Design a protein with these regions (language model features):
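Helix-breaking motifs and short loop linkers at transmembrane-helix boundaries and internal kinks
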Residues: 44, 96-101, 113, 269, ...
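Extracytoplasmic gate region of multi-pass secondary transporters
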Residues: 33, 207-248, 255
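Conserved MFS/SLC helix-loop-helix module at the cytosolic interface between two early adjacent transmembrane helices
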Residues: 62-99
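Helix-loop-helix hairpin linking two adjacent transmembrane segments in secondary transporters
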Residues: 100, 131, 136-185
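C-terminal transmembrane helical hairpin of 12-TM major facilitator-type secondary transporters
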Residues: 271-315
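A late C-terminal transmembrane helix in Major Facilitator Superfamily
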Residues: 322-355, 361
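Helix-to-loop junctions at the C-terminal end of transmembrane segments
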Residues: 64-76, 257-270, 350
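Cytoplasmic helix-loop-helix junction between adjacent transmembrane helices
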Residues: 106-142
Length: 382
Protein backbone atom coordinates (compact mmCIF):
# COMPACT_ATOMS: atom_id res chain seq x y z
CA UNK A 1 0.00 0.00 0.00
CA UNK A 2 1.32 3.42 -0.91
CA UNK A 3 2.18 5.52 2.13
CA UNK A 4 0.09 8.71 2.46
CA UNK A 5 1.86 11.87 1.53
CA UNK A 6 1.90 14.98 3.66
CA UNK A 7 -0.65 17.48 2.44
CA UNK A 8 1.04 20.54 0.92
CA UNK A 9 -0.40 22.84 3.61
CA UNK A 10 0.65 20.50 6.40
CA UNK A 11 4.12 20.12 4.94
CA UNK A 12 4.49 23.91 4.66
CA UNK A 13 3.43 24.35 8.28
CA UNK A 14 5.92 21.73 9.44
CA UNK A 15 8.78 23.32 7.50
CA UNK A 16 7.93 26.84 8.72
CA UNK A 17 7.79 25.59 12.31
CA UNK A 18 11.11 23.78 11.81
CA UNK A 19 12.66 27.08 10.72
CA UNK A 20 11.23 28.75 13.83
CA UNK A 21 12.63 26.03 16.09
CA UNK A 22 15.99 26.25 14.32
CA UNK A 23 16.05 29.95 15.19
CA UNK A 24 14.73 29.65 18.74
CA UNK A 25 16.65 26.57 19.84
CA UNK A 26 19.48 25.87 17.41
CA UNK A 27 20.63 29.49 17.30
CA UNK A 28 18.87 31.41 20.06
CA UNK A 29 19.45 28.84 22.74
CA UNK A 30 22.59 26.95 21.72
CA UNK A 31 24.73 29.42 19.74
CA UNK A 32 26.50 30.34 22.99
CA UNK A 33 28.11 26.88 22.99
CA UNK A 34 30.36 27.38 19.91
CA UNK A 35 30.89 31.07 20.74
CA UNK A 36 31.97 30.51 24.36
CA UNK A 37 35.58 29.41 23.60
CA UNK A 38 35.95 32.31 21.13
CA UNK A 39 34.77 34.77 23.78
CA UNK A 40 37.05 33.12 26.33
CA UNK A 41 40.08 33.58 24.09
CA UNK A 42 39.20 37.19 23.25
CA UNK A 43 37.81 38.56 26.51
CA UNK A 44 39.29 36.36 29.21
CA UNK A 45 35.86 35.01 30.10
CA UNK A 46 36.33 32.05 32.43
CA UNK A 47 34.58 28.68 32.40
CA UNK A 48 32.75 29.62 35.59
CA UNK A 49 31.55 32.83 33.96
CA UNK A 50 30.35 30.80 31.00
CA UNK A 51 28.37 28.54 33.34
CA UNK A 52 26.68 31.54 34.95
CA UNK A 53 25.81 33.09 31.58
CA UNK A 54 24.46 29.79 30.27
CA UNK A 55 22.39 29.34 33.41
CA UNK A 56 20.82 32.74 32.78
CA UNK A 57 19.57 31.44 29.44
CA UNK A 58 18.20 28.22 30.89
CA UNK A 59 16.51 30.12 33.71
CA UNK A 60 14.91 32.39 31.12
CA UNK A 61 13.66 29.35 29.24
CA UNK A 62 12.08 28.02 32.44
CA UNK A 63 10.41 31.37 33.14
CA UNK A 64 9.19 31.59 29.55
CA UNK A 65 7.70 28.10 29.65
CA UNK A 66 5.92 28.79 32.94
CA UNK A 67 4.73 32.19 31.70
CA UNK A 68 3.20 30.78 28.53
CA UNK A 69 1.62 27.94 30.50
CA UNK A 70 -0.07 30.39 32.88
CA UNK A 71 -0.86 33.04 30.25
CA UNK A 72 -1.43 31.26 26.93
CA UNK A 73 -2.90 34.45 25.47
CA UNK A 74 0.70 35.68 25.18
CA UNK A 75 1.11 33.27 22.27
CA UNK A 76 -0.50 35.03 19.31
CA UNK A 77 0.74 36.15 15.93
CA UNK A 78 1.39 39.71 17.16
CA UNK A 79 3.19 38.66 20.33
CA UNK A 80 5.09 36.01 18.35
CA UNK A 81 6.64 38.82 16.34
CA UNK A 82 7.47 40.64 19.58
CA UNK A 83 9.15 37.54 21.03
CA UNK A 84 11.10 37.21 17.79
CA UNK A 85 12.36 40.78 18.05
CA UNK A 86 13.38 40.20 21.68
CA UNK A 87 15.42 37.17 20.65
CA UNK A 88 17.11 38.97 17.75
CA UNK A 89 17.85 42.10 19.80
CA UNK A 90 19.23 40.12 22.76
CA UNK A 91 21.70 38.35 20.49
CA UNK A 92 22.83 41.53 18.74
CA UNK A 93 23.24 43.32 22.08
CA UNK A 94 25.76 40.70 23.24
CA UNK A 95 28.26 42.47 20.99
CA UNK A 96 27.87 45.76 22.86
CA UNK A 97 28.94 44.69 26.35
CA UNK A 98 31.84 43.20 28.25
CA UNK A 99 30.11 42.53 31.58
CA UNK A 100 29.12 39.06 32.78
CA UNK A 101 26.00 40.47 34.46
CA UNK A 102 24.86 42.06 31.20
CA UNK A 103 25.59 38.89 29.23
CA UNK A 104 23.57 36.89 31.76
CA UNK A 105 20.62 39.29 31.56
CA UNK A 106 20.65 39.21 27.76
CA UNK A 107 20.81 35.42 27.70
CA UNK A 108 17.93 35.33 30.19
CA UNK A 109 15.85 37.45 27.80
CA UNK A 110 16.83 35.16 24.93
CA UNK A 111 15.73 32.16 27.01
CA UNK A 112 12.28 33.62 27.67
CA UNK A 113 11.83 34.44 23.98
CA UNK A 114 13.12 31.01 22.88
CA UNK A 115 10.59 29.26 25.09
CA UNK A 116 7.74 31.40 23.75
CA UNK A 117 8.74 30.71 20.14
CA UNK A 118 9.20 26.99 20.80
CA UNK A 119 5.75 26.66 22.39
CA UNK A 120 4.10 28.68 19.60
CA UNK A 121 5.67 26.62 16.81
CA UNK A 122 5.11 23.24 18.48
CA UNK A 123 1.48 23.97 19.38
CA UNK A 124 0.76 25.25 15.85
CA UNK A 125 2.06 22.01 14.33
CA UNK A 126 0.04 19.95 16.83
CA UNK A 127 -3.11 21.86 15.89
CA UNK A 128 -2.59 21.07 12.20
CA UNK A 129 -1.54 17.41 12.47
CA UNK A 130 -4.77 16.32 10.79
CA UNK A 131 -3.66 18.33 7.75
CA UNK A 132 -0.35 16.49 7.61
CA UNK A 133 1.83 18.78 9.74
CA UNK A 134 4.56 16.64 11.30
CA UNK A 135 6.12 17.14 14.72
CA UNK A 136 9.03 15.01 13.51
CA UNK A 137 9.72 17.51 10.73
CA UNK A 138 9.31 20.44 13.11
CA UNK A 139 11.63 19.04 15.80
CA UNK A 140 14.25 18.30 13.15
CA UNK A 141 14.62 22.08 13.06
CA UNK A 142 16.41 22.00 16.43
CA UNK A 143 19.23 19.83 15.14
CA UNK A 144 19.29 21.69 11.84
CA UNK A 145 19.67 24.97 13.69
CA UNK A 146 22.55 23.58 15.73
CA UNK A 147 24.20 22.43 12.50
CA UNK A 148 23.72 25.90 11.03
CA UNK A 149 25.38 27.55 14.04
CA UNK A 150 28.29 25.13 13.78
CA UNK A 151 28.70 25.80 10.06
CA UNK A 152 28.33 29.55 10.54
CA UNK A 153 30.97 29.65 13.28
CA UNK A 154 33.25 27.37 11.27
CA UNK A 155 33.10 29.57 8.15
CA UNK A 156 32.80 33.03 9.71
CA UNK A 157 34.96 32.48 12.79
CA UNK A 158 38.29 33.14 11.03
CA UNK A 159 37.00 36.40 9.55
CA UNK A 160 34.83 37.97 12.27
CA UNK A 161 35.46 39.07 15.83
CA UNK A 162 33.32 37.56 18.58
CA UNK A 163 31.17 40.71 18.39
CA UNK A 164 30.70 40.17 14.67
CA UNK A 165 29.73 36.56 15.29
CA UNK A 166 26.99 37.63 17.70
CA UNK A 167 25.63 40.16 15.22
CA UNK A 168 25.80 37.52 12.51
CA UNK A 169 23.89 35.14 14.78
CA UNK A 170 21.17 37.77 15.18
CA UNK A 171 20.91 38.11 11.41
CA UNK A 172 20.81 34.33 11.05
CA UNK A 173 18.02 34.16 13.64
CA UNK A 174 16.00 36.77 11.74
CA UNK A 175 16.38 34.89 8.46
CA UNK A 176 15.30 31.60 10.02
CA UNK A 177 12.34 33.19 11.78
CA UNK A 178 10.97 34.77 8.60
CA UNK A 179 9.06 31.65 7.45
CA UNK A 180 7.66 31.14 10.96
CA UNK A 181 6.16 34.63 10.92
CA UNK A 182 3.66 33.29 8.37
CA UNK A 183 2.31 30.70 10.81
CA UNK A 184 -1.18 31.12 12.25
CA UNK A 185 -0.09 31.43 15.88
CA UNK A 186 -2.91 31.05 18.40
CA UNK A 187 -3.06 30.51 22.17
CA UNK A 188 -2.72 26.87 23.12
CA UNK A 189 -5.89 25.67 24.79
CA UNK A 190 -4.93 23.17 27.44
CA UNK A 191 -7.23 20.82 29.28
CA UNK A 192 -6.88 19.21 32.66
CA UNK A 193 -7.21 15.52 32.00
CA UNK A 194 -7.60 14.52 35.65
CA UNK A 195 -11.30 13.93 35.24
CA UNK A 196 -11.01 12.08 31.94
CA UNK A 197 -8.40 9.55 33.03
CA UNK A 198 -8.65 6.89 35.74
CA UNK A 199 -6.81 7.60 38.96
CA UNK A 200 -3.30 6.11 38.89
CA UNK A 201 -2.76 2.95 40.88
CA UNK A 202 0.38 2.18 42.91
CA UNK A 203 2.30 0.89 39.88
CA UNK A 204 1.35 3.91 37.76
CA UNK A 205 2.30 6.32 40.55
CA UNK A 206 5.65 4.58 40.92
CA UNK A 207 6.23 4.71 37.17
CA UNK A 208 5.33 8.41 37.10
CA UNK A 209 7.65 9.32 39.98
CA UNK A 210 10.52 7.35 38.43
CA UNK A 211 9.93 9.00 35.05
CA UNK A 212 9.93 12.44 36.68
CA UNK A 213 13.24 11.62 38.34
CA UNK A 214 14.72 10.33 35.10
CA UNK A 215 13.70 13.38 33.08
CA UNK A 216 14.91 15.79 35.76
CA UNK A 217 18.28 14.00 35.87
CA UNK A 218 18.50 14.14 32.08
CA UNK A 219 17.91 17.88 32.21
CA UNK A 220 20.80 18.27 34.65
CA UNK A 221 23.18 15.96 32.81
CA UNK A 222 22.64 16.68 29.14
CA UNK A 223 22.91 20.45 29.51
CA UNK A 224 26.42 20.16 30.96
CA UNK A 225 27.48 18.64 27.66
CA UNK A 226 25.36 21.07 25.65
CA UNK A 227 27.12 23.97 27.36
CA UNK A 228 30.75 22.87 27.45
CA UNK A 229 31.35 20.34 24.65
CA UNK A 230 32.93 22.86 22.27
CA UNK A 231 34.91 24.61 25.00
CA UNK A 232 36.28 21.24 26.13
CA UNK A 233 38.12 20.67 22.84
CA UNK A 234 39.66 24.15 22.67
CA UNK A 235 43.38 24.00 23.33
CA UNK A 236 46.89 24.04 21.89
CA UNK A 237 46.43 20.62 20.26
CA UNK A 238 43.39 21.68 18.21
CA UNK A 239 42.65 24.39 15.66
CA UNK A 240 40.04 27.12 15.88
CA UNK A 241 37.89 25.10 13.48
CA UNK A 242 37.73 22.01 15.70
CA UNK A 243 35.03 23.24 18.07
CA UNK A 244 32.61 24.57 15.44
CA UNK A 245 33.12 21.41 13.35
CA UNK A 246 32.28 19.31 16.40
CA UNK A 247 29.13 21.36 16.99
CA UNK A 248 28.19 20.84 13.35
CA UNK A 249 28.40 17.09 13.98
CA UNK A 250 26.05 17.48 16.96
CA UNK A 251 23.50 19.22 14.76
CA UNK A 252 23.76 16.73 11.92
CA UNK A 253 23.24 13.88 14.39
CA UNK A 254 20.31 15.64 16.08
CA UNK A 255 18.35 16.54 12.93
CA UNK A 256 17.07 13.01 12.12
CA UNK A 257 17.15 11.77 15.72
CA UNK A 258 13.48 12.20 16.65
CA UNK A 259 12.34 10.27 13.58
CA UNK A 260 14.92 7.55 14.21
CA UNK A 261 14.02 7.08 17.88
CA UNK A 262 10.33 7.07 17.01
CA UNK A 263 11.04 4.11 14.73
CA UNK A 264 12.92 2.36 17.56
CA UNK A 265 9.98 2.98 19.88
CA UNK A 266 7.53 1.45 17.43
CA UNK A 267 9.72 -1.65 17.16
CA UNK A 268 10.68 -2.18 20.81
CA UNK A 269 8.36 0.03 22.86
CA UNK A 270 8.63 3.61 24.10
CA UNK A 271 10.10 2.74 27.50
CA UNK A 272 12.84 0.51 26.11
CA UNK A 273 13.69 3.11 23.48
CA UNK A 274 13.99 5.77 26.19
CA UNK A 275 16.32 3.58 28.26
CA UNK A 276 18.42 2.85 25.17
CA UNK A 277 18.69 6.53 24.25
CA UNK A 278 19.76 7.50 27.77
CA UNK A 279 22.28 4.65 27.90
CA UNK A 280 23.82 5.67 24.58
CA UNK A 281 23.99 9.25 25.80
CA UNK A 282 25.62 8.27 29.12
CA UNK A 283 28.31 6.26 27.34
CA UNK A 284 28.94 9.08 24.88
CA UNK A 285 29.13 11.70 27.61
CA UNK A 286 31.61 9.53 29.54
CA UNK A 287 34.00 9.30 26.57
CA UNK A 288 35.71 12.72 27.08
CA UNK A 289 35.96 12.00 30.82
CA UNK A 290 37.83 8.76 30.14
CA UNK A 291 40.09 9.94 27.34
CA UNK A 292 41.43 13.34 26.26
CA UNK A 293 41.34 13.37 22.51
CA UNK A 294 39.40 14.31 19.44
CA UNK A 295 38.05 10.79 18.89
CA UNK A 296 36.44 10.79 22.34
CA UNK A 297 34.97 14.24 21.70
CA UNK A 298 33.58 13.06 18.35
CA UNK A 299 31.96 10.03 20.00
CA UNK A 300 30.42 12.36 22.58
CA UNK A 301 29.13 14.73 19.88
CA UNK A 302 27.49 11.91 17.93
CA UNK A 303 25.95 10.31 21.02
CA UNK A 304 24.76 13.61 22.47
CA UNK A 305 23.36 14.94 19.21
CA UNK A 306 21.77 11.63 18.33
CA UNK A 307 19.88 11.27 21.62
CA UNK A 308 18.97 14.48 23.43
CA UNK A 309 15.93 15.38 21.29
CA UNK A 310 14.93 11.72 21.10
CA UNK A 311 14.86 11.57 24.89
CA UNK A 312 12.53 14.58 24.97
CA UNK A 313 10.02 13.01 22.59
CA UNK A 314 10.18 9.54 24.17
CA UNK A 315 9.87 10.75 27.78
CA UNK A 316 6.84 12.90 27.02
CA UNK A 317 5.28 10.06 25.02
CA UNK A 318 5.76 7.68 27.95
CA UNK A 319 4.30 10.26 30.34
CA UNK A 320 1.26 10.69 28.12
CA UNK A 321 0.56 6.96 28.44
CA UNK A 322 0.24 7.21 32.23
CA UNK A 323 -3.03 8.23 33.95
CA UNK A 324 -1.71 11.51 35.33
CA UNK A 325 -2.72 15.13 34.79
CA UNK A 326 -0.72 17.36 32.42
CA UNK A 327 2.26 15.03 32.03
CA UNK A 328 3.99 17.07 29.30
CA UNK A 329 3.82 20.33 31.27
CA UNK A 330 5.09 18.71 34.47
CA UNK A 331 7.92 16.88 32.72
CA UNK A 332 8.97 20.01 30.81
CA UNK A 333 9.07 22.08 34.00
CA UNK A 334 11.29 19.60 35.84
CA UNK A 335 13.53 19.28 32.78
CA UNK A 336 13.92 23.06 32.64
CA UNK A 337 14.76 23.21 36.36
CA UNK A 338 17.40 20.55 35.79
CA UNK A 339 18.94 22.65 33.02
CA UNK A 340 19.29 25.59 35.39
CA UNK A 341 21.06 23.41 37.95
CA UNK A 342 23.41 21.56 35.58
CA UNK A 343 26.00 24.22 34.67
CA UNK A 344 26.14 25.57 38.23
CA UNK A 345 26.60 22.06 39.62
CA UNK A 346 29.93 21.60 37.83
CA UNK A 347 31.36 25.08 38.48
CA UNK A 348 33.52 23.79 41.40
CA UNK A 349 35.26 21.26 39.12
CA UNK A 350 35.80 23.59 36.17
CA UNK A 351 39.42 24.56 35.69
CA UNK A 352 42.02 23.77 33.09
CA UNK A 353 40.08 20.63 32.15
CA UNK A 354 36.42 19.69 31.68
CA UNK A 355 37.03 16.04 32.59
CA UNK A 356 35.32 16.35 35.97
CA UNK A 357 32.30 18.07 34.47
CA UNK A 358 31.80 15.34 31.88
CA UNK A 359 32.28 12.61 34.50
CA UNK A 360 29.55 14.17 36.64
CA UNK A 361 27.27 14.53 33.60
CA UNK A 362 27.82 10.89 32.61
CA UNK A 363 26.95 9.65 36.09
CA UNK A 364 23.79 11.76 36.21
CA UNK A 365 22.61 10.56 32.79
CA UNK A 366 23.37 6.97 33.86
CA UNK A 367 21.11 7.53 36.87
CA UNK A 368 18.46 8.85 34.47
CA UNK A 369 18.74 5.63 32.44
CA UNK A 370 18.34 3.50 35.57
CA UNK A 371 15.30 5.48 36.70
CA UNK A 372 13.78 5.23 33.21
CA UNK A 373 14.29 1.46 33.31
CA UNK A 374 12.42 1.35 36.61
CA UNK A 375 9.63 3.50 35.19
CA UNK A 376 9.34 1.21 32.18
CA UNK A 377 9.04 -1.89 34.35
CA UNK A 378 6.48 -0.23 36.63
CA UNK A 379 4.42 0.99 33.67
CA UNK A 380 4.33 -2.43 32.01
CA UNK A 381 1.02 -4.31 32.31
CA UNK A 382 1.18 -6.85 35.13
Amino acid sequence: MERPRLAPRGRAIGVAAAAGLAAAMGVGRFVFTPLLPIMTASTGLGAGDGAVIATGNYAGYLVGALLLTRLPQLSRRGTFLAWSLVLIASEAAMAASAQVAVYTALRFAAGVASAAIFIACASTVSRHRAEGASLGVAFAGVGSGIAVTGLFTLLAGPHLSWQGLWIGSAVLTALLLAPAWLLDIRPEIGTDVTGSRPAPGPRERRAWLLLLGAYFAEGVGYIIVGTFLVAAVAGPDTTAATGPALWLVVGLAAAPATVAWHAVARRFGTGRALVAALTVQAVGVAAPALHDGLVAALISALAFGGTFMGVVVLAIDLGNRLPVARPAATLTTLYAIGQVIGPLLVVPVLGSSFTGAFAIAAMIVAVAAALAAGATRAAAPS
